[in-house]
Amino acid sequence: MSGLAACAKALSARGVKVALLGKCNSGWLIYVYRPAMLAARLASPDTRGFLRSMGYTNQSAWLETLRAHLKTNPTFPHEIGVFLDYPLSDVKAFIEHAGADYCCAGIWKAYSNPISAQRTFALYRKCREVYMACYRRGLSISRLAVAA
């Protein structure tokens, strides 16, 4: 069993899915997510409308569409931000402004609500630090993933 398959199996028991999206410059793009949380995130009418406008017509095949966009788009498909739980307004603004004119940057480029964005960036940074420290101490991926 490959390392990725073993990781996917271990995470599956915790309600976490692993999807191989495609090859990128230096390796592979892997999307790790909780299906119920992704469905809730993408359920808003505004998000569904945005994804439809970007060519995501079949809700049950959105990850396959994202995978196809990664293969065929000469530039990175920036709508991936909604799959990563970036604010929809920031994803749209990033596309509209071609990545320029943002008010602050961290995990993503924020175009509105800089205080909220910076708070989220700090939370993500702290979470990453804690999890990396636990991993370095020998905790397995399956132990690090909490059941939802």
In which residue ranges do the predicted regions lie?
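Short linear loop/turn motifs
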Residues: 25-26, 64-66, 95-98, 105-112
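Short capping loops/turns at secondary-structure boundaries
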Residues: 59, 73, 80-88, 110-113, ...
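Generic secondary-structure signature for well-ordered alpha-helical cores
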Residues: 12, 96, 100, 129-133
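Long, compositionally biased
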Residues: 19, 107-148
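Helix-hairpin-helix/helix-loop-helix acidic hairpins
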Residues: 60-74
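Short glycine-enriched loop/turn motifs at secondary-structure junctions
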Residues: 23-24, 74-76
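A glycine-rich, hydrophobic loop/mini-helix early in the fold
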Residues: 1-60
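Hydrophobic/aromatic-rich, well-ordered segments within soluble, folded domains that form packed cores
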Residues: 77-103
